[in-house]
Amino acid sequence: MPSLCIIALFGTLTFYTLIPSIHTLKCVICDSPMGNYDCKTTYPAATECPGSSNNYCYKRETFASNGNLDQIRRNCNPVAASSKACKDLENGAKICEYSCNTDGCNSVAGMEPTRAVYFIAILMLTFYTFIRL
């Protein structure tokens, strides 16, 4: 009987881990040098993205030709950034774009665990539990 409960628990946790939750993506939205935040070290809390742009959060860094960071923009975006993160412009400047799709992932501390990490942890816990039985 305990193993049946464990299987039911594992199935429920797997379902909630693998099925995307139905909620609006929350991203940090700021634009430097405009506004109250510099968008590099200070930025507002993540807010819900509008329905038309709620697929990805992004961060864009613009560097001058001398290599200095000119602008940081964090926002919501309907499409992911290209696979090549940085591109050089003709005038020697460079633009780097990054996208992600978890709440607040475009913040400075945006390293949030993905669903795969949760799934692996649940799988390991279940495996350990079965071995102990």
UniProtKB/Swiss-Prot annotation:
Keywords: Disulfide bond, Secreted, Signal, Toxin
Major site of localization recorded for this protein: secreted
An MF annotation (GO) of this entry: toxin activity
Secretion signal span: 1-24
The name this protein goes by in its record: U-scoloptoxin(05)-Sa1a
Record's miscellaneous remark: The scoloptoxin-05 family has remarkable similarities with the three-finger toxin family commonly found in snakes.
Tissues in which the UniProt entry reports expression: Expressed by the venom gland.
SUPFAM superfamilies according to UniProt: Snake toxin-like (SSF57302)
InterPro entries the UniProt entry points to: Snake_toxin-like_sf
Signal among keywords: yes
Subcellular location: Secreted
Superkingdom field: Eukaryota
Pfam family, one: UPAR_LY6_2
Tagged with keyword Aminoacyl-tRNA synthetase: no
Family membership: Belongs to the scoloptoxin-05 family.
Modifications after synthesis and translation: Contains 5 disulfide bonds.
Annotated GO CC locations: extracellular region
Disulfide bonds: none
